[in-house]
């Protein structure tokens, strides 16, 4: 190997070796937020019951905030596709860590299965979270719903929350 090739290889090896120790360091770890519950609140003052035809706000409450996350996409839906949804679709999570919300109107009384899917692009490494929780992790929400956390390789976390709600007349 001549000197010219050696001079090109040394900087790359130095960079590679310098970064390899950080892969499992918690301070460089991206983490998704951990959710505790999905709460529904009527928009009409004084109301406590969700009613058909009346708007209400659905909030996914975080138990702990995420960390080192950038582009984030939220999608709210219901299993029957009957609810009217209005929500913020994209945020930069580290700048906007508020709880995700959806304003919903149900056309009729009944049970509706709500789903929120969030994709959090990681700006740090995801291996710390995967090493601690696995690449597919489920937990129960305090309100009877469920949360599923999936690590998308080195690049993102996917979080799915599900809960059935009751809407009255």
Write out the residue ranges for each language-model feature:
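Generic preference for well-ordered secondary structure
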Residues: 3, 22-24, 44, 149
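Bacterial Sec-dependent N-terminal signal peptides
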Residues: 13-41
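First exposed extracellular module after export/assembly in secreted or surface-exposed proteins
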Residues: 30-169
């Amino acid at each position: 190997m001549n000197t010219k090739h050696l001079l090109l290889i040394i900087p790359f090896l130095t960079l590679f070796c310098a970064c390899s120790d950080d892969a499992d360091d918690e301070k460089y770890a991206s983490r998704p937020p951990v959710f505790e519950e999905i709460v529904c609140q009527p928009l009409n003052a004084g109301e406590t019951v969700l009613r058909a035809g009346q708007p209400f706000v659905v909030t996914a409450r975080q138990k702990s905030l995420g960390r080192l996350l950038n582009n984030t996409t939220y999608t709210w839906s219901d299993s029957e596709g009957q609810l009217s949804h209005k929500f913020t679709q994209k945020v930069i999570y580290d700048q906007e860590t508020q709880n995700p919300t959806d304003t919903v109107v149900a056309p009729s009384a009944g049970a509706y299965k709500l789903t929120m899917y969030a994709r959090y692009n990681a700006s740090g490494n995801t291996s710390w979270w995967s090493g601690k929780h696995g690449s597919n992790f489920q937990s129960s929400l305090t309100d009877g719903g469920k949360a599923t956390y999936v690590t998308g390789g080195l690049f993102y976390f996917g979080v799915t929350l599900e809960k059935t709600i009751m809407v009255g007349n």
